[in-house]
Amino acid sequence: MFNKFDTKPLWEVSKTLSSVAQGLEPADMVIINSRLINVCTREVIENTDVAISCGRIALVGDAKHCIGENTEVIDAKGQYIAPGFLDGHIHVESSMLSVSEYARSVVPHGTVGIYMDPHEICNVLGLNGVRYMIEDGKGTPLKNMVTTPSCVPAVPGFEDTGAAVGPEDVRETMKWDEIVGLGEMMNFPGILYSTDHAHGVVGETLKASKTVTGHYSLPETGKGLNGYIASGVRCCHESTRAEDALAKMRLGMYAMFREGSAWHDLKEVSKAITENKVDSRFAVLISDDTHPHTLLKDGHLDHIIKRAIEEGIEPLTAIQMVTINCAQCFQMDHELGSITPGKCADIVFIEDLKDVKITKVIIDGNLVAKGGLLTTSIAKYDYPEDAMNSMHIKNKITPDSFNIMAPNKEKITARVIEIIPERVGTYERHVELNVKDDKVQCDPSKDVLKAVVFERHHETGTAGYGFVKGFGIKRGAMAATVAHDAHNLLVIGTNDEDMALAANTLIECGGGMVAVQDGKVLGLVPLPIAGLMSNKPLEEMAEMVEKLDSAWKEIGCDIVSPFMTMALIPLACLPELRLTNRGLVDCNKFEFVSLFVEE
């Protein structure tokens, strides 16, 4: 039963709300002179009042009779009011911010609730990491609704993570007040091949009558997609083509249109609505992964709504996609997602619908943001020691740690991972490389860099070796512990010396992201919380990330959010070719393949 994210549950205040609506008791707050965006009927209702009591909406209409001596009256002065915005799929860890700092960053932009999938920290710290993020969020006004990570590891047997989550763990977490469903079921092969583990975690969620969120990245809309949805998966954010999003909506699956820092899918997938003229009730706008400099520069869901409008989606439709549609997806529309009697009093004031400029934000009947700034305090949370000490590398990393051997060869053909800028997929390419002193050489002239993934959770000493293409770097190295989803230590570069320096720099600072050239650190973002997040403020983090972005450009890479693209190199649930600490993975066949192509 949903009652964790309200000031008071409806059954405790139903008499009061009914009395306030009838003028028998005064409201706590009344908003007057607003232009109500009614997401239930997709219309603007002029000159509308809203009466609020006990953190909930008591009346929508003429509320003069609800105003008492101590009622707080807010004059909207003709501004639009809309339900508070909900992000249906977000990994807070990708912001590199703590949950409390993330809340401070997004609430002034109209975001009142997030459906957080903390599978990044869970891969490092297990369910303890999930608990830490829940505790961090409790001191904020933001409604932090959590989905239990479903795929830890993302694809069992192909990588080493800090923890594992099974059906029995999911069953236990479904009892937690903050858990509203299951995080993205990335192991779609497990669903389609009917593995006990995949169907077990889905089944435990369905038994609890909670929402199973999805991740179906295959460009297939027939029997596979049908089988995936039939298992109980309710939504998916992995559509990159309009036809994929349309097919999912037609099958009753909520298609989540993604617009984050690195993945700009909205331009294409919005055509599912604009070109096909279909009902948009099964469409939701989400961010998935957003970096600090993006939050600081562009905002959050307000920016994504604006982008949707720019792509031809009607403003009221776009607002439905971050309010009632999202609430219905998570079976919470009886509590969230609309400005209607009985619902949580989560309301945003919008100056105009073209620029989606947010002027005020109310959560649970309290004014929490005004003029782009938070007006309420947020409690600081200190992460425990195990979260701050997550770098467990067995062997000392030296330049020799990056040797890729091919004895008695002068040249060899290697499988190379080619990235696709601003997309999550990769291509498998075959490239001939030189061998010197039995060591395979990368080739920056062909845009081919060396890549190594070191296990960092259990001191196993394992490492996977490969090559990547598409970054455009001529000299230098990059390293990151943000390396989805196992978050081992990933290093790419043109020479072993810079690669060793990059790796050891992150080991010393507890994890993060770094760019190195000619023995010099050009940009560093320390992420001491599980090697994923920092307790620094947004502005400071944005500055460090911007400096790192500049460092990438300095060494020759000009793609958008290159560190996010780099972070997906080890993610073995996405096509086509990936590298984990155990080796090179063909993600179409889900099998390990040799680094070298057999002649």
UniProtKB/Swiss-Prot annotation:
Its EC number is 3.5.4.2. It comes from the Bacteria. InterPro entries: Adenine_deam, Adenine_deam_C, Amidohydro-rel, Metal-dep_hydrolase_composite, Metal_Hydrolase. Pfam families: Adenine_deam_C, Amidohydro_1. One of its GO terms (biological process) is adenine catabolic process. The keyword Transmembrane does not apply. Keywords: Hydrolase, Manganese. It is an enzyme of class 3 (hydrolase). It catalyses: adenine + H2O + H(+) = hypoxanthine + NH4(+). GO terms for molecular function: adenine deaminase activity. Its cofactor is Mn(2+). Belongs to the metallo-dependent hydrolases superfamily. Adenine deaminase family. HAMAP family: Adenine_deamin. NCBIfam families: ade (TIGR01178). This is Adenine deaminase. It comes from Clostridium botulinum (strain ATCC 19397 / Type A). The lineage of its organism: Bacteria, Bacillati, Bacillota, Clostridia, Eubacteriales.
